[in-house]
Amino acid sequence: MIPAHWLYCLMLLLPIESCRILCQASSKSKEKVTSRPHDVCDGVCNNNGTPCFQSCPPDSEGNMKFACKAKKWHKVTETCHTLNTHSIFEEDKELYSVQSSDSTIRTHMFHRELKTIMDTLMEKCPKDLSCVIKGIERSPRMPGNIAVVVQLLHNISTTLTKDVNEEKMQSYSAMANHILNSKSISNWTFIQDRNSSCVLLQSIHSFASKLFMKEHLINISHVFIHTLGTVVSRGSLGKNFTFSMRINETSDKVTGRLLLSPEELQKVPSAFQVISIAFPTLGAILEASLLENVTVNGLVLSVILPEELKNISLIFEKIRKSGERKSQCVGWHSLESRWDWRACKTIQENSRQAVCRCRPNKLYTSFSILMSPNTLESPVLTYITYIGLGISICSLIICLAIEVLVWSQVTKTEISYLRHLCIANIAATLLMADAWFIVASFLSGPVLHHNGCVAATFFVHFFYLSVFFWMLAKALLILYGILIVFHTLPKSCLVASLFSVGYGCPLVIAIITLAVTEPGKGYLRPEACWLNWDMTKALLAFVVPALAIVVVNLITVTMVIIKTQRAAIGSSMFQEVRAIVRICKNIAILTPLLGLTWGFGIATVINGHSLAFHIIFSLLNALQVSPDAAVDSELRECVHRFCG
């Protein structure tokens, strides 16, 4: 066995010391063979952060790394691989059946293998690259083998700089098809280099961009990768490519289409190549390897176009044809390795497909649709929301009308004037917020009207913040009335302070949020006219003030209850009952008025999937302001006198 290894080392021109260590490792592996399972760790799992390493199964190299989570070992990465120069090119496999316990030696040999595979490939079949296909296709799709093939495809794409023919593209696609198989998706999770799937996408696109078409049409079809290419002239009346592929062996076919309009083709000075590559499983592979919380819901279409073509249309059939979740057209950001909704615009969408208009460039060359993970759509919730908004708007209009009718009667004292000033402004701002919310809901959907959406979102943000800050002003006013005598400050000073808090603070917050996030297109959500969360966390500009005000209002309610309880101490039973009723009235009024019910609104932000939170918030939101007018005895008496 030793002479064979020495012969191998001489063939690869490896250092003598490496060969000696390699031979020693081989001898040790023959002396000691264990029968323990290779996918389970033997170490003690004690959650101290120390990983566990296990050796690979026989006839493979590398190791498996485990991490302790919840007192159980979970596999994190795996570098086990069987592919090497000899297994791929059907040479003496015994030369690479070495099992080494030294991870440094394995890593060194792993990189030397990749170089040797590439060198041997260029020596044996440089014209069509076909001599590696059989060896790769019969190899198991373990994580280490996937990494070897990805690196090989990357090396090929960087080595061959021009004049890629159809035969080479056919072989290259066959290699990629093996690791794009739907059965290999779970193994991508354990590849040591998390960017391997990104490297694969970039390598395939780079290699295909060097394709030179002798004929006017190229059609290279495999199960998990399909390439179409043609030559298009400037005067062509549009062009489209249609792909139809299965996600796995049992699924129905899913289609994807690339359309080039005649108007766009007029921008190109002469004949040019158009190449498009479709991947049915690459979206799931990107999700698995990068561990992203996104779901690709269509084919991934990669395009190679001249720079003059600035806009293309793409039609994606949905893999999961659900009407409850919206889809978002996206492009793959090649530098940041993520899906970016700024590359595309959703033109039309239904339960079966989405139509996208995208802007290909050097950063965005691959496109697909994502299923929105947070958009909760339910007919029941929609009805409750709009019915609740209708009730709220009607109540607010009635409340404002009553305030106008009886204003002179209920504002005779300073405290009454300030209290009703807060009530009127809360009603007015909430009315405007509800109205702009309805406008924003009509502008949302598959087709986002960006400028209109920005305006609607700004006003919704501003007026809902104004509601909160006027609630804060009312809470501070109540607190001020309990602790301090009102006539210590002039009335004009108090009014100016209330307006500064109620309108000044939210206006500053809304303007700063817009100015900071909109230049980078991070102000809006991709699927709705509301503040962005995933990219810029602009939603915090609403959640943080709202949460802070809710806490302040809770403290205020507590202090009001304590104060009224103290007033009831020492009185007769009748007075105690009246005090308890008064406390209940305070809670009934202050809870909706001071925004405590908006805690459920924040809960809908934290847990967007909970239908119960959305329904409770919608119902409670309909009760804003109107309870205060309903239980105010002074207001009822004035209305009775006015109507009577």
Curated annotation (Swiss-Prot):
Region: GPS, residue numbers: 329-377
Extracellular side: 19-386, 444-465, 515-541, 607-610
Observed phenotype of the null mutant: No visible phenotype.
Positions of transmembrane segments: 387-407, 423-443, 466-486, 494-514, 542-562, 586-606, 611-631
Key words of the record: Disulfide bond, Glycoprotein, Membrane, Signal, Transmembrane, Transmembrane helix
Compartments where found: Membrane
InterPro entries referenced in this protein's UniProt entry, alphabetically: Adhesion_GPCR (IPR051587), GAIN_B (IPR057244), GAIN_dom_sf (IPR046338), GPCR_2-like_7TM (IPR017981), GPCR_2_secretin-like (IPR000832), GPS (IPR000203)
Positions annotated with a glycan in the UniProt record: N155, N219, N293, N311
Principal subcellular localisation of the protein: membrane
Side of membrane Cytoplasmic, spans: 408-422, 487-493, 563-585
GO cellular component term of the entry, any: membrane
Keyword RNA-binding in record: no
GO terms classed as biological process: cell surface receptor signaling pathway
One example GO MF annotation: G protein-coupled receptor activity
Tissues and organs where the protein is expressed, per its UniProt entry: Mainly expressed in skin and heart, and very weakly in lung and spleen. Detected in all epidermal layers of skin.
Source organism, top-level taxon: Eukaryota
Residues annotated as signal peptide: 1-18
Boundaries of every GAIN-B domain copy: 233-377
Membrane topology note: Multi-pass membrane protein
Note: Most adhesion GPCRs undergo autoproteolysis at the GPS domain. ADGRF2 is not autoproteolyzed at the GPS motif because of the lack of a consensus catalytic triad sequence within GPS region of the GAIN-B domain.
Its job: Orphan receptor.
Family (UniProt): Belongs to the G-protein coupled receptor 2 family. Adhesion G-protein coupled receptor (ADGR) subfamily.
Protein known as: Adhesion G-protein coupled receptor F2
This protein's encoding gene: Adgrf2
